[in-house]
Amino acid sequence: MTHQNLLVELFVEELPPKALKKLGEVFATQLCAQLRQLGLASGDSVSTPFASPRRLAAHITQVAAKAADTAVQQKLMPVSVGLDADGLATPALLKKLQALGADVSDPVFAVAALRKAPDGPSTGLRTGKAEALFYDSLVTGATLDVGLQQALLAALAQLPIPKMMSYQLETDCELPGWSSVHFVRPAHGLLALHGSAVVPVKVLGLTSGKQTQGHRFEAYKSPVQVDHADAYAATLLRDGAVIASFPDRRFAIVQQLAQAAERLGPGFEVLMDEALLDEVTALVERPNVLTCQFEEQFLAVPQECLILTMKANQKYFPLLDTQGKLTNQFLVVSNISPSDASAVIGGNERVVRPRLSDAKFFYDQDRKKTLESRVAGLDKVVYHNKLGTQGERMARVCAIARTLALQLGGEALAKRAELAARLAKTDLLTDMVGEFPELQGIMGGYYARHDGLDADLAEAIEDHYKPRFSGDALPRNPVGVVVALADKLETLVGMFGIGNLPTGDKDPFALRRHALGVIRMLVEKDLALDLNALVAAAVPAFGDKISDASSALCDFVYDRLAGSLREQGYSALEVDAVLALRPQRLGEVPRRLAAVRVFTALAEAPALAAANKRIGNILKKADTTAAVDAHVSELLLQEDAEKALYAAMQDIAPRAQAQLDAGDYAAALQTLAALRAPVDAFFDGVMVNAEALDLRLNRLGLLKTLHLAMNQVADLSRLAA
């Protein structure tokens, strides 16, 4: 059985750049997976994707020319059903064999080819299983030309194509005509090589060969002939001026960008952007980085505006100086490498100039009006048909911000937070944010400084959307933290109140991100705010527009917190134990988790966790018959073990409580670990459910007192195996 490496390439018109990387990866992995299912590729086969603007390809190692034949054993029916009293085939058996493709022209011969075996495994108690008839056959393995045809069609069907194109292709049959083909872009060539041999397959109206096309403008040969599957990438580069590998092409771009910046001098740094790098890599087949520049007058515009327009609209890479300030030079990744690049450079400089002029015009126009003068305009902008206008939203954020600020910093902080919240959304009405919504908040900060507001207020307006994404910085000052918290709470409470909850992977209002933002601020800033009170304080700001979904929202926040903590490396048991208590101060959660980790390392931990779980079960069962109070009468303590436990509690519990009050959770749990011996002795020597009611309730009260003392940091029963 011949094993060779396989290469399949689909040559197409320019593919969508933002989808190219994913298309290439899925094409290769799916093709390899389909070949594995057919037995043509093995578990050791490795797939390598190739993707350029005009091609999708996959190189797969160790592909067989023919899959191995497979022995198939199929149970037909019980012998009593398949054979009559004379041992001849019944009509039911013949029909079954015929359906399987067996030759039933001679029923006696057909029966002789069957195998009798017990129907199921025998056991020591019962060995006399009823016999069944089994049909053994050999399934011929698929040949590569048949298997690849099937695998290729299946792989193309699995591609993540958001929108198909329909195009006409001339048929190659005897009768002239046209047929409709559906694919992401029109396909013009198919290459399929097993080693050096062409595998005859046909998809999308194309028949496979060993020729493809190179660079649209700079190929050294046309067509490009690939003589071996392993020579694909090298041949395309040598004869077609194409770097077929997406990662190799991306690496070449990064290298050229760094070299171009280095040539300009030590003070230049390329503003790299992973998404932009991927998109540009998908736009060129052989990159050539060129240095361009624009007029210095545009540097008077906030650099975020210029950077965004260069990256989003033109796919350029801005250059920064050593202070992180934008320079008037930028880098372009071209798809051609002319001997004289001046025309390409001039064209790019000419194209970017109107974009920068627009940005400067927007900036100049926006500064003619103050943010305060725009506040009234928020009443004309609809935020949500059930939650009113941006003006109403602003009023709610102001009210929530005032409530939070009074708790964190008193009246002085409340006044500044209210002012920042009042102006925070006004940049939505500016021309710049209208053109570039990504700049909301950022432009508000610039315009606030222009209006004469102090740095803290300007930063608060700029930062109130933070954190915008995972790993983003938090607001820089207390005013910003208050307004950012208020803004996110307003969104969460409002959306939950009207029933707009995230479902599956759909979260149009980014409620998960807002919840994580609230969590990060409460935890990392260690704010003295209770979660339930925080949510409850935001509800009245909505009046009768919403229903109170505080409980569901708090559950949602704890759920996001649990996921975040697990991502940080805490175990599910640790997280579950701490969050089972629903701690209100989220800033305490890391300290509680650290304490639990210290506790679980103690020798006493497993026994105490198991005892805690046992106590919880006893109390839960007891509470169904009568309420149990955490009260102990020393006069009713009769057994030595319960007296010893009570005495230990009297000694240890106050010390642990003092440590808890001081916030030293780890020390408190270590102190409580000393209860292991008296707890074990109690369960060994005391009957909790005594017949005398007063004794029983007293012992339950002792256990409840113990349970409350042990579970103030975390629910230790969740740590039990």
Features from the language model and the residues they span:
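Amphipathic alpha-helical "coupling" segments that flank catalytic cores
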Residues: M1-A721
